[in-house]
Amino acid sequence: MARVKRAVNAQKKRRTLLATASGYRGQRSRLYRKAKEQVLHSMQYSYRDRRDRKGDFRQLWIQRINAGARANGLTYNRLIQGLKLAGIEVDRKILADLAVNDAAAFAAIVEKARAAVAEEGTGGAAAQAA
């Protein structure tokens, strides 16, 4: 059986891993073992954070919507309740963009939500009295 020499493959493997770790500080970009450990951790962090990013953006959108709603005299939860009652289906990403970039359109949406909440509030009282 022929002898297998692995120097070329091993060097290529090490070279590609060190190239992956090229932006890291100190030994983590120069020494193979340290670089390998750091690259493995980096991949785990990126996997985790790709999932966390969805929640982070939703949280940011809610903060922006709440700030815009409070500027128009309504809280976030009342705004969302009013949008559901009014049958307005706009997602939080678009609402946040409107709150930041188009205050007039956002104010119009808030007014429709406020009217729907007020109508539901008076309708409920009238139904109980009857």
From Swiss-Prot:
InterPro entries: Ribosomal_bL20, RIBOSOMAL_L20_CS, Ribosomal_protein_bL20_C. It comes from Salinispora tropica (strain ATCC BAA-916 / DSM 44818 / JCM 13857 / NBRC 105044 / CNB-440). NCBIfam families: rplT_bact. GO terms for biological process: ribosomal large subunit assembly; translation. This is Large ribosomal subunit protein bL20. Keywords: Ribonucleoprotein, Ribosomal protein, RNA-binding, rRNA-binding. The gene is rplT. The lineage of its organism: Bacteria, Bacillati, Actinomycetota, Actinomycetes, Micromonosporales. It comes from the Bacteria. Belongs to the bacterial ribosomal protein bL20 family. Gene3D superfamilies: 6.10.160.10, Ribosomal protein L20.
